[in-house]
Curated annotation (Swiss-Prot):
Cofactor remark: Binds 1 Mg(2+) ion per subunit.
Segments forming a coiled coil: none
Keyword Translocase attributed: no
Catalytic reaction equation(s): alpha-D-glucosamine 1-phosphate = D-glucosamine 6-phosphate
Protein name: Phosphoglucosamine mutase
InterPro entries from the UniProt entry: A-D-PHexomutase_a/b/a-I, A-D-PHexomutase_a/b/a-I/II/III, A-D-PHexomutase_a/b/a-II, A-D-PHexomutase_a/b/a-III, A-D-PHexomutase_C, A-D-PHexomutase_C_sf, A-D-PHexomutase_CS, Alpha-D-phosphohexomutase_SF
Species name: Prochlorococcus marinus subsp. pastoris (strain CCMP1986 / NIES-2087 / MED4)
Enzyme class: isomerase
Keywords: Isomerase, Magnesium, Metal-binding, Phosphoprotein
Binding site for Mg(2+): 97, 236, 238, 240
Name of encoding gene: glmM
Length: 452
């Protein structure tokens, strides 16, 4: 049996790779594998398929003899935050993060509020194999009610991270991308005193992430300029990521957020060994400038679970990804886009500086180009020998190195594509090398796939 888990749980197109039956069995498997009788916390984003999958998972949990509590539509970080605070035995978030509406996913958390480790993934898959003959009709339909009191604990927790600080007088635009951030992002900023303009704020599972949010910044850039705002923040579908935009439309991605936030902690002498954690996607300009001010950047594979593992190992206080997924000790590394946004806003207010000026004081990024090579197969589902051959092919291209030039290639953990990152000091070299590698790699992968 091929693993159903990718870099961030289980993900796929609803009713094709991710079915009602699979969700039911995952709920059952988690229920069987939990070590306590405390309820399992479940939530979802706004996708149309979300409620169907919630019903399947909750029935599976009940079939295993365990109870669940339904949080409703919520940001993903609400699940691990509340697991830790309220002592749930585990949690499930139904979301495909930044992916289009037809996708959905299952993110699973253990009783510590952490993404489950490989050992538990294997245990769940083993239970799934033995649960193939489990009959859905044996179990009655489950009553599903939202728990608003728990959600309020989460939002109050975010507000409390600000202490006595506020955002009075700040004009801020938020793009909630028809997703989880629609539940609370605007109200949290308003309670902190900000003058808020919010766009794409309907809970619409057919529009989630479409031409909006952290992967499409044109709408928020336009709204910032039209409203003469100080800054803006654009979230992804489940609000665990955020990208900032200054008053002139310049983008503050995860690298910039890590550098600016990290530098504040460095100056306050709070960073363990002056270290922050990022991934192999992090910009060389970021790393080189961070080193110049006395910092150490530790890189991991792409994925917040790898960042979290490195944070624990290095005893770091801050880590994240260029995509805007930031993990901070402030909320026990729950990876919360709304938390990141209010903290960045707080620093600007506290320092009496515009986000534009703060960005200018950071680093000059090297030009990067990220290209996707479409695969006619899912990398994780192919035979081991083919996988090794493709990995060798990828490695041969990844080893292309010149002065101040970097190539990083990886299979997507959520989509049937290879992601090719090329980085160099000038755009011409980036474009030339990217075109060459993409063409050659596409040809080789196509030839390999014809032998399947």
């Amino acid at each position: 049996m091929q693993s159903i888990f990718g870099t961030d749980g289980i993900r796929g197109i609803f009713d094709k790779e991710l079915t009602y039956s699979l969700a039911y069995k995952v709920g059952y498997a988690l229920g069987v594998s939990t070590k306590t009788n405390n309820p399992i916390l479940i939530g979802r984003d706004t996708r149309v398929s979300g409620y169907i999958l919630i019903e399947a998972i909750s029935r599976g949990i009940n079939a295993a003899g365990k109870e669940f509590i339904y949080l409703g539509i919520c940001p993903t970080p609400a699940i691990p935050f509340l697991i830790k605070k309220e002592k749930f035995s585990g949690g499930i978030m139904i979301s495909a993060s930044h992916n289009p509406p037809e996708y959905n996913g299952i993110k699973i958390f253990d009783n510590n509020g952490e993404k489950i480790k490989k050992k538990l993934e294997n245990q769940i898959e083993l239970i799934l194999e033995t649960a193939n003959n489990l009959k859905l009709s044996t179990y009655k339909k489950t009553s599903i009610r939202e728990n608003n009191n728990l959600f309020n604990i989460y939002t109050e927790g975010l507000i409390n991270t600000m202490g006595d600080e506020n955002l009075d007088g700040m004009k801020i635009v938020l793009d909630t991308c028809y997703g989880s951030a629609t539940t609370c992002a605007a109200s949290i900023f308003q309670k902190l005193g900000a003058n808020v303009k919010v766009i794409n704020n309907e809970q619409d599972g057919l529009k989630i992430n479409l031409n909006c949010g952290s992967t499409c910044l044109d709408p928020i850039i336009k709204a910032i300029k039209e409203n003469n705002a100080d800054m803006g923040f654009s979230f992804d579908g489940d609000a665990d990521r955020v990208i900032g935009v200054d008053s002139e439309g310049n983008i503050i991605d995860g690298d910039h957020i890590l550098f600016l936030w990290g530098r504040e902690l460095l100056e306050e002498k709070l960073l363990t060994n002056n270290t922050i954690i990022s991934t192999k996607m992090a910009n060389l300009g970021f790393e080189n400038t961070w080193k110049k001010i006395g910092g150490i950047l530790h890189r991991t594979e792409v994925g917040d679970k790898f960042i979290f593992e490195a944070i624990k190992k290095k005893k770091a206080l801050l880590g994240g990804e260029q995509s805007g997924h930031i993990l901070s000790k402030i909320n026990d590394f729950c990876g919360d886009g709304i938390l990141t946004a209010i903290q960045i806003s707080k620093y600007c207010k506290k320092k009496n500086i515009s986000l534009r000026s703060w960005l200018n004081s950071s680093f000059s990024p090297y030009p990067q180009k990220l290209t996707n090579v479409l695969l006619n197969f899912k990398f994780k589902n192919i035979d081991k020998s083919y996988k090794e051959f493709i990995n060798e092919t990828i490695e041969s291209f990844s080893n292309i190195k010149k002065d101040n030039c970097r190539v990083y290639i990886r299979p997507s953990g959520t989509e049937p594509v290879l992601r090719i990152l090329v980085e160099a000091r000038n755009q011409q070299e980036v474009d030339s090398l990217s075109t060459k590698i993409t063409a050659e790699l596409s040809t080789k992968i196509y030839k390999i796939s014809k032998t399947f």
